[in-house]
Structures are given as structure tokens and as C-alpha cells.
Design a protein with these regions (language model features):
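C-terminal engagement/docking regions of AAA+ P-loop ATPases
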Residues: 1-2, 9, 241-323
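Pre-Walker A (pre-P-loop) alpha-helix and adjacent loop at the N terminus of AAA/AAA+ ATPase modules
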Residues: 8-51
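Conserved alpha-helical scaffold flanking the Walker A/P-loop in AAA+ ATPase domains
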Residues: 34-38, 91-111, 140
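Walker A/P-loop
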Residues: 40-77
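Walker B catalytic acidic pair
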Residues: 50, 113-114, 125
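P-loop (Walker A) phosphate-binding loop of NTP-binding proteins
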Residues: 51, 85, 153
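AAA+/P-loop NTPase substrate/partner-engagement loops
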Residues: 66-94
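Canonical AAA+ ATPase core
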Residues: 92-97, 118, 122, 130-222, ...
Length: 323
């Protein structure tokens, strides 16, 4: 069943109410909030590359409060074990049986802070749960539930003692973006309310977690014209053929684009995807999936520059609205 224009209008209104609510706690970052919310509704995960103190924890808590969900924060360190993330089976002496104690990964919104400080083994455990939305221990499967959003963070400045995420694992994040510092006027407003140590505490839930799951299902029903599908495939192919790129956009990356483009279109009140949606999302969806060759890196070429070049080179179709 394809989304109707009436459903698209409802989706847009609800989406904007969610953004407005989160924006009360994370001021001046509506575009980033919209991207993260769209990722959650597309049932993907987010990688934030930011310096400390830019509001990552506030974003996670505010988003959880807005959808009446739970939130956890995992501080990744070199000695963190996979079981510290997923949970552990413990023998209950009174009940005379083994019981699974869920780890912090079982929450609606999980902030995986400084993911690149954990060992590759622990990183892999997290990324496996992100991919499967479940944990299997001793042959028993435990579902994470819906919604399930991991917001992983990396500090772009301090690299000592870190383990770089391999390209195959970076590919599992739906988007990569940065909150960044607020402008002066927003900073002034934040300072005026600095006595409020938990800005998300006063937020009211806009919808329930079950309603979020329904929105995700509705977003997936947005129509995509064959011409737009081909446009995405041509862009992905162009990144793989670019002389500056050693590793271009994979098929997984192209699928990721379609998933979030559907939600993005619905958030704009449309029941169909336009080429402009692809252009608007190209940087956050694809920048972390491109691996530059050594010569291009030495010359100062960035993945953003390659994406811009490819978008200019690939002709966008004249997409028609769905009937």
C-alpha cells in the first residue's frame, strides 16, 4: 500500500511537532534534529563526529522523552567488553535457573559515546545489534524493540588511544553528521537557562513508541519512481568510477539513501520522492561511505567535494508525482 496525500500531510505535521519538541532542549539545530529523527523513522543509526559539549547527550534524552521511550548512554573505553553492552546470563540461585540481564543496548535511544575508543571486538558486538535489532545469547534471541536508534559519537580532535572504525562498519550507519557549536544568539539563550541541568526533563511526550513504529511503517510506503531509483544507482556508480575514490558508495549505501529519502519526502508533506530529496541527503548519507585514494587526500580533496562533483555530473530526472 502506497502512502496517500492525506497520510503525507499527517506525517508532515507530526514530524514537525516532534522536531519542535526536541528543539526546545537542543536549540538552534533543527536541521540536525530533523536528520536524526528521519534516521530513526527510517530505522537506521547515526554517527555524530563532534567535540565534547555540543549537545549530543541532550539530543538523545530529548528524543527519547519526545517519543515516550527510554534512553541509555554507554561510555566506550578500551576495557569495555561486549557483554557490558549486550548483557550477560547470570544464575539465579533462588529460582535455580539462568536469567539474562539485559545490557544498556536495550533502549529506545542509545548514545554510544566515543565508539572509537572501544576494542574492535566490542565495536563489532554493537554494530551486530544495530544491524539485526536483536541479541542472541546461549541460543535465546532477545529483540531490542521499536524504535531502536543508536547515536554513536566520535571526537574528531583527540585520536590517541582510539580504534578507527573500518569502512565496512562505517557503512552500517545510515547517516554521519555533526551538531557543531551554536551561533552567538543561541549560545546566549542557552547560557540564560544554564541553571537547568537537564533540559529534556520538562519535555512532554508527543507520541508513543508504538506510534513511532507506525510512522516508520508509513514512511516506508512512500512512492519512488523508477527514474529516481535509476538516478540513485547512477550516482552510486559515478562515485565508484571517480578517479579520487578508492571505495565508492556500495549497494547498501544506495539502499540506505532510498530508505531515508522516503521518510524525508514524507516529512515535507509528499507521498513521493523527488531528485531534490536525494541531493539534500547525499552528504550525510554518503560522505562516510567514500574512501579517498592517497593522492586525492594529499591534494586536500574531501568526500564532500567528490559528492558535489558527482551530483553536478549526473543528470537528475524529471520525476513525476505518484498518482
Amino acid at each position: 500500500m502506497t502512502m496517500t496525500p492525506e497520510q503525507a500531510a499527517w506525517f508532515q505535521g507530526t514530524f514537525q511537532r516532534l522536531v519542535d519538541n526536541v528543539d526546545r532542549a537542543v536549540q538552534g539545530k533543527r536541521e540536525i534534529v530533523s536528520l536524526v529523527l528521519a534516521s530513526m523513522l527510517a530505522e537506521g543509526h547515526v554517527l555524530l563526529e563532534d567535540a565534547p559539549g555540543t549537545g549530543k547527550t541532550s539530543l538523545a534524552k530529548a528524543l527519547a522523552a519526545t517519543v515516550q521511550g527510554t534512553s541509555t548512554r554507554i561510555q566506550f573505553t578500551p576495557d569495555l567488553l561486549p557483554s557490558d553492552v549486550t548483557g550477560v546470563t547470570i544464575y539465579d540461585q533462588q529460582q535455580h535457573r539462568f536469567e539474562f540481564h539485559k545490557g544498556p543496548i536495550f533502549a529506545s535511544i542509545v548514545l554510544a559515546d566515543e565508539i572509537n575508543r572501544a576494542s574492535p571486538k566490542t565495536q563489532s558486538a554493537l554494530l551486530e545489534v544495530m544491524e539485526e535489532s536483536r541479541v542472541t545469547v546461549d541460543g535465546v534471541t532477545h529483540e531490542t524493540g521499536r524504535p531502536f536508534l543508536v547515536i554513536a559519537t566520535q571526537n574528531p580532535i583527540e585520536q590517541a588511544g582510539t580504534y578507527k572504525l573500518p569502512e565496512a562498519q562505517l557503512d552500517r550507519f545510515l547517516i554521519k553528521t555533526s551538531i557543531g557549536y551554536p551561533d552567538i544568539s543561541v549560545t546566549e539563550s542557552i547560557l540564560a537557562g544554564a541553571s537547568d541541568r537537564n533540559p529534556s526533563a520538562g519535555l512532554s511526550a508527543i507520541i508513543t513508541t508504538s506510534a513511532v513504529a507506525d510512522m516508520a511503517d508509513l514512511g516506508a510506503s512512500v512512492h519512488v519512481e523508477p527514474a529516481v531509483l535509476r538516478y540513485v544507482a547512477e550516482i552510486a556508480e559515478a562515485t565508484r568510477e571517480d578517479s579520487a575514490i578508492r571505495l565508492g558508495v556500495s549497494v547498501r549505501g544506495a539502499i540506505a539513501m532510498i530508505r531515508i529519502a522516503k521518510v524525508w519526502a514524507a516529512s515535507q508533506g509528499r507521498h513521493f520522492v523527488l531528485p531534490d530529496d536525494i541531493k539534500a541527503l547525499a552528504r550525510p548519507v554518503w560522505q562516510h561511505r567514500l574512501l579517498l585514494d592517497a593522492e586525492a587526500e594529499f591534494a586536500g580533496t574531501s568526500s564532500d567535494a567528490v559528492i558535489a562533483r558527482v551530483l553536478d555530473a549526473v543528470a537528475a530526472p524529471q520525476a513525476r508525482a505518484a498518482a
